[in-house]
């Protein structure tokens, strides 16, 4: 009887170890983390986060006209026609899961155009403070969030702002491409970085 109990306990122990290994392997293949060390947050995960607390999503603007051979939309300091298409596609996918949000951009042509094409008619508020990319960006985010504490916020800003936030909040090296984004939230007066937004 004692031998049977020992054998049974060993079997259970091995089973638990196998389950743990399977879980670890599953996490490894799920690509839950970006190569830069930031958690990856897709549309569905973002929607679940938004049910827990309002989210703040910061996007880099779409493709710049002055750094591309693609056709410009209009002003050379703005975005390309391809950039408008990419912004509209991103906006459609985003709005399908997060339909209710306030929209902001810094006061440059490229961020304003990106936000406009992303939103498909939603009211846009331009705020020059969103061009400041040191600690000032946190004050700007908290100020916007305090105006409507229960609303999600989308901000169109610049790559150096996103790079600064990732390094400052999580010591991560983040070099955002056009329309890459970060997900944040404000809690008890503090701004937290949740991860990198991945559109799929």
Curated annotation (Swiss-Prot):
Superkingdom of this protein's organism: Bacteria
Protein name per its UniProtKB record: Lipopolysaccharide core heptose(II)-phosphate phosphatase
Signal sequence annotation: 1-25
Functional summary from the UniProt entry: Catalyzes the dephosphorylation of heptose(II) of the outer membrane lipopolysaccharide core.
Gene3D superfamilies to which the protein is assigned, alphabetical: Phosphoglycerate mutase-like
Cited InterPro entries: His_Pase_superF_clade-1 (IPR013078), His_PPase_superfam (IPR029033), LipoPS_heptP_Pase (IPR011310)
Record organism: Escherichia coli O7:K1 (strain IAI39 / ExPEC)
Gene Ontology molecular functions: phosphatase activity
GO terms for cellular component: periplasmic space
A Pfam family recorded for this sequence: His_Phos_1
Family of the protein in this entry: Belongs to the phosphoglycerate mutase family. Ais subfamily.
Enzyme Commission number(s): 3.1.3.-
Gene: ais
Keyword Signal attached: yes
């Amino acid at each position: 009887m004692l031998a049977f109990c020992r054998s049974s306990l060993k079997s259970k122990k091995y089973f638990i170890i196998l389950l743990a290994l399977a879980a670890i392997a599953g996490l490894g293949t799920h690509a839950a983390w970006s190569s830069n060390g930031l958690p990856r947050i897709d549309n569905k995960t973002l929607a679940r986060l938004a049910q827990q607390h309002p989210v703040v999503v910061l996007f880099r603007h779409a493709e710049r006209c002055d750094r591309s051979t693609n056709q410009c939309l209009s002003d050379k300091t703005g975005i390309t026609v391809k950039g408008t298409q990419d912004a509209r596609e991103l906006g459609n996918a985003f709005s399908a899961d997060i339909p209710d949000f306030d929209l902001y951009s810094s006061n440059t042509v490229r961020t304003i155009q990106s936000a406009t094409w992303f939103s498909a008619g939603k009211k846009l508020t331009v705020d020059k403070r969103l061009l400041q990319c040191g600690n000032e960006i946190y004050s700007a985010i908290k100020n916007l969030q305090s105006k409507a504490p229960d609303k999600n916020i989308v901000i169109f800003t610049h790559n150096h702002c996103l790079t600064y936030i990732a390094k400052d909040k999580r010591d991560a090296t983040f070099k955002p491409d056009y329309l890459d984004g970060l997900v944040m939230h404000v809690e008890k007066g503090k701004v937290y970085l949740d991860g990198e937004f991945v559109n799929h």
